[in-house]
């Protein structure tokens, strides 16, 4: 049984050419990431069958949706599509919107129950309301719920938070976090926001001028020095950790990572729970030995993988091995020379701030 998704498309329209080929896991969230105009939405529409490329091939696990002699039309593809602007039926209630596609799916093909979606997205207080009375974040939650209730084998999300204000984005992100952990449906998530991608995705396809520049597990691509992600102002790495203890006196949670322990703001969760952390490159400084006295309490042993010149020529981005994972440190070239830090050296990373992703 094939559990992967494979896609390839070629299209030349006007002055834009899309020429992509990639494989992704058939589970979890794959982010289609790139700057505006890189081809993200065009690619998503080819996957949905809403547009047809001159050449294309698409296989979702064991199902072929497109090949040289086959094109499954959009209404025959078991997929859900969430757009930037939620397209809800204004004359129907929230509940009727949710059930619109669900009622058209044969019972034996229904893989998601309305009660589950209502619980995951906390829609119970809204189900009797008219959609026109909802906030932007509420409308998008309903649109996501409606897409899920079509029992899709693939969920496509085209910048679902792009039209929301900051408060609405912060409102909906926790629901997406929870949803993606509960779902057994692969998701293609289009975004040009590094924050969204790092928080939600496990896999990444990086698009640039209509081509796939790179693809793979998100942390591998976030920390690759030949890719722009490692040189962004908000460059960071995603690290896996385990809850080791809760320090109630200081309202902190202690997280076990390879070689040490990191203290973060208190997080609810049982001992042994796996979590993900986001560590910004700008929040990691380097030392040759642990400082005896410092306000930065998080200090862990790491090994220098390589040192790369940053976009800002006075700085470098240092890749550091933390066990089998990689984190980044953005420091000045002067400090690297003063400490004589070289590739392969064992040093200590002082981590000023750590953000919990989940």
Swiss-Prot record:
Catalytic class of the enzyme: translocase
Family as reported in the entry's similarity comment: Belongs to the ABC transporter superfamily. Molybdate importer (TC 3.A.1.8) family.
Gene from which the chain derives: modC
The keyword Hydrolase is assigned to this record: no
E.C. code: 7.3.2.5
Subunit details: The complex is composed of two ATP-binding proteins (ModC), two transmembrane proteins (ModB) and a solute-binding protein (ModA).
Topological category with respect to the lipid bilayer: Peripheral membrane protein
Protein name, as recorded: Molybdenum import ATP-binding protein ModC
Function: Part of the ABC transporter complex ModABC involved in molybdenum import. Responsible for energy coupling to the transport system.
Positions of the Mop domain: 293-358
Keyword Cell membrane found: yes
């Amino acid at each position: 049984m094939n559990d992967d998704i494979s896609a390839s498309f070629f299209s030349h329209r006007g002055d834009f050419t899309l020429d992509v080929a990639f494989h992704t896991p058939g589970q979890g969230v794959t982010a289609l990431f790139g700057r505006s105009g890189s081809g993200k939405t065009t690619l998503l529409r080819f996957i949905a069958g809403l547009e047809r490329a001159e050449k294309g091939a698409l296989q979702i696990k064991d199902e072929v949706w497109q090949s040289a002699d086959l094109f499954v039309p959009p209404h025959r593809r078991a997929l859900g599509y969430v757009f930037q602007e939620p397209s809800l039926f204004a004359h129907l209630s929230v509940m009727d919107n949710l059930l619109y596609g669900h009622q058209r799916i044969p019972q034996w093909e229904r893989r998601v129950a309305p009660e589950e979606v209502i619980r995951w997205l906390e829609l119970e207080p809204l189900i009797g309301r008219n959609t026109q009375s909802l906030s932007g974040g509420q409308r998008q939650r309903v649109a996501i719920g409606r897409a899920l209730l079509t029992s899709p084998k693939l969920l496509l999300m085209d910048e679902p938070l792009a039209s929301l204000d900051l408060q609405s984005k912060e409102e909906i992100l926790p629901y997406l976090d929870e949803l993606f952990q509960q779902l057994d449906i692969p998701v293609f998530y289009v975004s040009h926001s590094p924050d969204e991608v790092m928080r939600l995705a496990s896999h990444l396809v990086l698009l640039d001028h209509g081509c796939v520049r790179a693809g793979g597990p998100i942390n591998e691509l976030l920390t690759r020095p030949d890719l722009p992600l490692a040189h962004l102002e908000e460059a960071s790495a995603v690290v896996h950790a385990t809850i080791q203890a809760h320090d109630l006196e200081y309202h902190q949670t202690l997280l076990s990572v390879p070689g040490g322990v990191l203290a973060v703001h208190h997080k609810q969760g049982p001992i042994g729970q796996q979590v993900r952390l986001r560590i910004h490159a700008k929040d990691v400084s380097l030392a040759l030995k642990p400082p005896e006295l410092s306000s930065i309490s998080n200090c862990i042993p790491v090994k220098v993988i390589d040192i790369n010149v940053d976009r800002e020529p006075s700085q470098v981005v240092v890749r550091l091995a933390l066990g089998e994972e990689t984190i980044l440190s953005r420091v000045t070239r002067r400090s690297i020379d003063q400490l004589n830090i070289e590739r392969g050296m064992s040093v200590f990373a002082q981590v000023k701030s750590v953000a919990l992703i989940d």
